[in-house]
Amino acid sequence: LQTPSILKLAAMYRNGTSLQTLVDHLLYVQKIEAGMIKLRISKVDIVVLAKQITDPFHELAETEGINFTVESLNEPLLLWIDVEKISSAIRNLLSNAFKYTSPNGKVIFKMNRIEIDGYSFCSIIISDTGKGIPEELRGRIFESFITGENTPLFSNKVGIGLRIVKNTMDLHHGTVNLDSTLGKGSTFTLLIPEGNAHFCRGPV
């Protein structure tokens, strides 16, 4: 029975849960930037991991009427990473892509192995045909509080989530870059270095 009181309580619960998630993310960002978060590094086939991450999004794509394409590698690519954190970063970007893409739009996940200045990287590109990001926000998109404007295109959760993605890539000595056109979509590119020489000899 959906009485007004029950509906009000349900709304309060959702808002409270959302606020707690926001606070948890903020505290996590503060811990990362204070050097309190340590990586749990293991050698992983990123091709297998990517399939595990992207597979559930095919069902979401069907439900939302979005064309979801995955272009991966045909052979293993071993990386030294914190599986939980890298997985979370990729899911965050994919979730945002679906969130801001309308039915009949496209989301593309593409993985490659590339070389830059003699160094090998895993390149993960997540692009969409969504709303795009306003030009005035692009230069500070990875800051925690860029969305105080609360525009219809963005929310505080997205701003903090992207900050966590940026921090995760920093911890892995990688990069995350954005290319976006308002009204046409966005492309996020992750570059994760191969090998483990870039990590400190001490605990990470």
Predicted regions located by residue number:
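Helix-loop junction within the histidine kinase core
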Residues: 30-41
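Short alpha-helical segment of the dimerization/phosphotransfer core of two-component systems
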Residues: 14-19
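Short conserved segment of the HATPase_c
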Residues: 133-145
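Glycine-rich ATP-lid/hinge loop adjacent to the conserved G-boxes
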Residues: 146-156
